[in-house]
Amino acid sequence: MNKALFLCLVVLCAAVVFAAEDLQKAKHAPFKRAARCFCPGKPDRGDLWILRGTCPGGYGYTSNCYKWPNICCYPH
């Protein structure tokens, strides 16, 4: 019984390590996970972030408009 419990613990720890490593790679992904959107009065297209209250940092967004419950963020 102890060997089976130890084996389950080892498998669980390995799964946590691999999941954490995968999340580190996802943080530095080269693409945005946003859809296209258009706001009234803006000539360009923006990035629609679904179920967010604010625009995420690090993408250079300077303006936005709300399309409840989503937000459309503009980089210009």
UniProtKB/Swiss-Prot annotation:
Q: Can you list the GO cellular component terms from the UniProt entry? A: extracellular region; nematocyst
Q: Which molecular-function annotation in GO is an example for this chain?
A: potassium channel regulator activity
Residues making up the propeptide: 20-31
Q: Which domain of life is it from?
A: Eukaryota
Which keywords does this Swiss-Prot/TrEMBL entry list?
Cleavage on pair of basic residues, Disulfide bond, Hypotensive agent, Ion channel impairing toxin, Nematocyst, Neurotoxin, Potassium channel impairing toxin, Secreted, Signal, Toxin, Voltage-gated potassium channel impairing toxin
Briefly, what is this protein's role? Blocks Kv3 voltage-gated potassium channels. Reduces blood pressure.
The family assignment reads:
Belongs to the sea anemone type 3 (BDS) potassium channel toxin family.
This protein's name: Kappa-actitoxin-Avd4l
Provide the taxonomic classification.
Answer: Eukaryota, Metazoa, Cnidaria, Anthozoa, Hexacorallia
